[in-house]
Amino acid sequence: MSLWLEASMPDVSPDSATELWKTEPQDAGDQGGNTCILREEARMPQSTGVALGIGLESAEPTALLPRAETLPEPTELRPQKRKKGPAPKMLGNELCSVCGDKASGFHYNVLSCEGCKGFFRRSVIKGARYVCHSGGHCPMDTYMRRKCQECRLRKCRQAGMREECVLSEEQIRLKKLKRQEEEQAQATSVSPRVSSPPQVLPQLSPEQLGMIEKLVAAQQQCNRRSFSDRLRVTPWPIAPDPQSREARQQRFAHFTELAIVSVQEIVDFAKQLPGFLQLSREDQIALLKTSAIEVMLLETSRRYNPGSESITFLKDFSYNREDFAKAGLQVEFINPIFEFSRAMNELQLNDAEFALLIAISIFSADRPNVQDQLQVERLQHTYVEALHAYVSINHPHDPLMFPRMLMKLVSLRTLSSVHSEQVFALRLQDKKLPPLLSEIWDVHE
């Protein structure tokens, strides 16, 4: 997708994400009510270095956030492998590794009780952050587990509970859908001679076709509006000493400014999604705050070049894994980005399929703080049905294409969790993010 801004970058940085929802009078020249209404207030310093040109094929920025100024260049970028295998059998008298209560089984890789299992799952899905009022050293038992949530969550992690094992309700539904599709495909291949009535493939209704055309047109329209903003992003440093303080600060500014442009473009595009502006303002903000990084990663995957294993954000300027590391990103975040981008590239999705995937990601009712979950589910279902019909028509000989695409949204949830760890590392390093990014990613100073 090309996500987009109407106005050039002003000189004032927004104090919060809510300022992105301030509306301006609609231009009478806009057609069909598709005006990109955005109170653009992000500060982008005028580049003093070489201006980077941008074309229509230019890539979208992603939330690539430096971790520390003095991070050395890695020599190996290999993720640690985790051992897999069945959980040991239980004898019936095992105790929870977190609080000492009676264990009910192995949950998220740890022998634990139902209470700690549910607590860990809720904490991960909501992205909860707790505060201990006793210095962070509370002894954990069945009594204290109710008194100190921070120490309980820490004990869960120390015991070995893994966030990537947590599935949201949406992920469970998508996995069930994929399993049903695979079983159906297997049954078809095993008994091809059994006569059966021809399968009725979904058809695109005129309303669905019009909606898809509107989304693709919005992509193209808003892509043209964002060029001037990217031109004003601090350029990537070309300095004799790449490890100098000035070069490190310039790389940090480069990526954070790209992230600001991306967030503003996502807001701009979301306002053109049918049904989005009918939600309450609070639900609009709640949906975008947690889906922004997933949309950024989808956009990043569109710019992946498998030949050079690089990602192009600006015209004639590509970033490989080493460039990401020089900017301060952790290896644990770099490698999943490239692996996800490679997997998405193999699907060879077109503009319409990307636009629908992004809409489905935005309309996720299980996001934290969403009030009207039923309405959000209805809106998401509209886009899921449109994608199913579209894929069935464009990939008639690949019945697994649709579930494969939806499973990428599950992968995005895992990547989003890794991104949260990257942002938390910034907080520990006392790196100052612009106010907009701090609020979007809940970095509380």
From Swiss-Prot:
InterPro entries, alphabetized: Liver_X_rcpt, NHR-like_dom_sf, Nucl_hrmn_rcpt_lig-bd, Nuclear_hormone_rcpt_NR1, Nuclear_hrmn_rcpt, Znf_hrmn_rcpt, Znf_NHR/GATA
Annotated spans, Disordered: 1-34, 63-86
Keywords annotated in UniProt: Activator, Cytoplasm, DNA-binding, Metal-binding, Nucleus, Phosphoprotein, Receptor, Transcription, Transcription regulation, Ubl conjugation, Zinc, Zinc-finger
UniProt-annotated location(s): Nucleus; Cytoplasm
Keyword Secreted listed: no
Post-translational modification: Ubiquitinated. Ubiquitination by UBR5 leads to its degradation: UBR5 specifically recognizes and binds ligand-bound NR1H3 when it is not associated with coactivators (NCOAs). In presence of NCOAs, the UBR5-degron is not accessible, preventing its ubiquitination and degradation.
MF terms in GO: chromatin DNA binding; DNA-binding transcription activator activity, RNA polymerase II-specific; DNA-binding transcription factor activity; nuclear receptor activity; RNA polymerase II cis-regulatory region sequence-specific DNA binding; sterol response element binding; zinc ion binding
Sequence similarity: Belongs to the nuclear hormone receptor family. NR1 subfamily.
Name this protein carries in UniProt: Oxysterols receptor LXR-alpha
Organism: Mus musculus
Lineage: Eukaryota, Metazoa, Chordata, Craniata, Vertebrata
